């Protein structure tokens, strides 16, 4: 992994009681050794694999202003991180889920892109066995379950300040509260919505198929091609690029897919992250509610599975063997 750490600082937030969240500030930057490199590689991997929300700084963002000064050399990275940690404490203390933790600020490069990552990491206790086969207690950072993390694409921010996607943050296990916390701390507003972009892509695909007057099988084959490209990008950790997608798809009429989507004003970005749950709709139908969960391949619709909109009735011809076995057992009273 070509990850190069430029500067990294650690501080700590300690919850003394329900009303007090203390801050402990480090007096020097963390030395970059193999342990630190391994930790950042793991944190980068975990962060990259999780679902993220996008944002951009508000004009009055204190963090953005402080970061600009730090980037210009008016303040060193340690001083920037110490002041930011104090602001972080003030914002986090407003929320009932505040538990403290290790605060990490890391400026690093990955694949020619410069990032600033900010995280609050929880610590966990575990046990290890030493050479004498005795048990020892160990304390470790719970990086795999990190959910209070934000990252600024410094390269994008400085070269394209009008961008709506240079700032990302995790949605977190406590949902909207974490989003609110990061918005307050960063003084940022919501930017590009990846799920909306993916939904727009699906609508554009359906409309393009309709313009090409494709039959049912042809439409599903086209959707499958779109899904294959998008899934490959997702697995590779790359974004969906409309131009590349268009080049991989057949053209109907005088316009290729990219030209069609631009003319119809779907407001699709040139590239955007793939959203797994949305893209799955290209090849599957799925839904749940009222104690019922249904999931089936789209190609079965109209062949083995039929829907009557007048009565809202779904008819399935041929059930899976394991389901059929359960139904037979229950019907016979076993």
Swiss-Prot record:
Gene Ontology cellular component terms for the protein in this record: bacterial nucleoid; cytoplasm
Q: Which GO terms describe its molecular function?
A: double-stranded DNA binding; single-stranded RNA binding
Q: Where in the cell is it found?
A: Cytoplasm, Nucleoid
Q: Which UniProt keywords apply?
A: Cytoplasm
Q: Does the keyword Transmembrane helix apply?
A: no
> Where primarily located?
cytoplasm
Q: Which HAMAP family match?
A: NdpA (MF_00730)
- Assigned protein family: Belongs to the YejK family.
Protein name (record): Nucleoid-associated protein plu2870
- What organism is listed for this UniProt entry? Photorhabdus laumondii subsp. laumondii (strain DSM 15139 / CIP 105565 / TT01) (Photorhabdus luminescens subsp. laumondii)
